[in-house]
Design a protein with these regions (language model features):
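Active-site-proximal beta-alpha core segment in soluble small-molecule metabolic enzymes
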Residues: 1-6, 13, 17-194, 208
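Active-site anion/phosphate-binding pocket segments in diverse small-molecule metabolic enzymes
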Residues: 1, 5, 13, 56, ...
C-alpha cells in the first residue's frame, strides 16, 4: 500500500494546489482490488473515485466508501433509482439519455448528480463537440442540465491519443474548452471540469482544469512504453508471485505440455507452477516468457495451461517445492516487468495484463 501512497503523492505533486484528484478504481482497481485501493485513496485524501459500471460503484458503497463516485460508462436509465439511493454520480452522454434519467428520477424522487460527457474526438460516448456540432450540442447540453431531478455538477471529456500525440490532444482540448464556453454563454457554469487522464496528467498541465483523473499511473505504470520514466517517480504497486508445486526430472526428447510445442534437448528439471491462463497468465507467454527465482530467469517451456505452467530450473538447482517465483515484479536482483511481458507477440498493453488477473489469485496487501 505504501507504493500506492507514493504514486498518489507523486502525482499530486504535479498539480497546483486546489486541483481535485479522481482516482480510477474501475476493473477491480486495475486488477489490484477495487475496495482496498479505494479505501487507501480515500485515506490519502482523494476527492473522487471513478468506476465503469453501477455494480462497481455499489460494491464501493457497500464497503463503506463515502467519497463521490463517478460512473464513466453506461448505466441504463431504469437504474436511476439505485444511482440516487447510493449517491452515485452518472456520466450523461446525450440529451435523450438525460431525459430518460430525469423521468426515472422524478418517479422515485430525489436528485441525481450527473457529469456531462463530451465527445471531442474519442468517438465513444458524449455530446458531439466537433467544430460543426458545437452550437447544437451546447443547446442540447443546456436543455439537459435544466431537466428536473438532475444536478449537473461537472463536464468532462476523454483524450484518445494523449500518450502519443500532442497535436491530437490539443485539438480535443480546444474543442472541450470551446463547448464549455458556449454553454457558459447560454447561462450555465459547471463547478467541475475535467479531462486529464494518466498521460495528460504527466504531459499536459494545461489540461488539469478543476480535476485530474489518473488511472494506470496510480498503479505505477506508464500509459505507453515510449514515454519517459523520468516524467514522474512511479513505483509498480503489484507483484505477481507463485510457489513451485513440484519439481520433476524429465528426460531429453520429452515434449512439454499441450501440443508438444517444446522438445527437451537435455535431461531437465522442470518446476510446475500452479498458475495459468485461467488466472490471467496469458497463454501467449508459452515458450516466450521467463519467471524469476532469486534474480535468475527460468523460461516457460511448452504451452501455458489453464491452471499450470512449466518452467526450466535445470540451471537453478536451489529451486524446490515451495520456492517463490516472481511472474511480474522485481526481487532486487532481477526484474520481470509487466511491460516486458506485454511486449511479447502478440503484443498487448500493461492495462490488459493487470486487469485480467482473475479472482482466483489472492491479493495480499502489505
Amino acid at each position: 500500500m505504501e507504493k500506492l501512497a507514493h504514486n498518489y503523492h507523486a502525482l499530486r505533486g504535479l498539480t497546483p494546489y486546489g486541483t481535485k484528484f479522481m482516482g480510477l478504481v474501475k476493473a477491480d482497481g486495475y486488477g489490484h482490488g477495487a475496495v482496498p485501493m479505494a479505501k487507501k485513496l480515500e485515506e490519502l485524501g482523494a476527492d473522487y473515485l471513478g468506476v465503469a459500471s453501477l455494480d462497481e460503484a455499489i460494491e464501493l458503497r457497500e464497503a463503506g466508501l463515502k467519497l463521490p463516485i463517478l460512473i464513466l460508462g453506461c448505466t441504463p436509465a431504469l437504474y436511476a433509482g439505485e444511482l440516487v439511493q447510493y449517491n452515485i454520480t452518472q456520466a450523461c452522454y446525450d440529451l435523450e439519455y438525460a431525459k430518460a434519467l430525469s423521468a426515472q428520477v422524478q418517479k422515485g424522487g430525489g436528485e441525481l448528480c450527473i457529469h456531462i460527457q463530451c465527445d471531442t474526438g474519442m468517438t465513444r460516448l458524449g455530446f458531439l463537440c466537433q467544430e460543426d456540432c458545437q452550437d447544437r450540442s451546447a443547446r442540447e447540453i443546456l436543455e439537459a442540465v435544466k431537466l428536473p431531478g438532475l444536478k449537473a455538477e461537472g463536464i468532462f471529456t476523454h483524450f484518445a491519443q494523449s500518450d502519443t500525440s500532442e497535436e491530437a490532444t490539443m485539438v480535443q482540448f480546444d474543442r472541450f474548452l470551446a463547448i464549455i464556453e458556449k454553454v457558459k454563454a447560454l447561462g450555465y457554469t459547471f463547478s467541475l471540469r475535467h479531462c486529464a487522464n494518466s498521460a495528460a496528467t504527466l504531459l499536459y498541465p494545461a489540461t488539469y482544469l478543476d480535476m485530474v483523473r489518473p488511472g494506470i499511473v496510480l498503479y505505477g505504470h506508464l500509459p505507453d512504453v515510449s514515454m519517459d520514466p523520468g516524467l514522474c517517480d512511479l513505483q509498480p504497486v503489484l507483484e505477481l508471485k507463485s510457489r513451485v508445486g513440484t519439481v520433476r526430472q524429465v528426460p531429453a526428447g520429452a515434449q512439454v505440455s499441450y501440443g508438444g510445442t517444446f522438445t527437451l534437448a537435455r535431461d531437465s528439471r522442470l518446476a510446475v507452477l500452479p498458475v495459468g491462463y485461467g488466472d490471467g497468465y496469458r497463454r501467449a507467454f508459452s515458450n516466450q516468457l521467463s519467471v524469476l527465482f532469486d534474480g535468475q530467469k527460468a523460461p516457460i517451456l511448452g504451452r501455458v495451461c489453464m491452471d499450470m505452467c512449466m518452467v526450466d530450473v535445470t540451471d537453478i538447482p536451489e529451486v524446490e517445492e515451495g520456492s517463490v517465483a516472481i511472474l511480474y515484479g522485481s526481487d532486487g536482483k532481477g526484474e520481470q516487468s509487466v511491460e516486458m511481458a506485454a511486449s511479447l507477440p502478440p503484443a498487448t498493453i500493461s492495462y490488459e495484463l493487470l486487469v485480467t488477473i482473475t479472482k482466483r489469485i489472492p491479493r495480499v496487501y502489505l
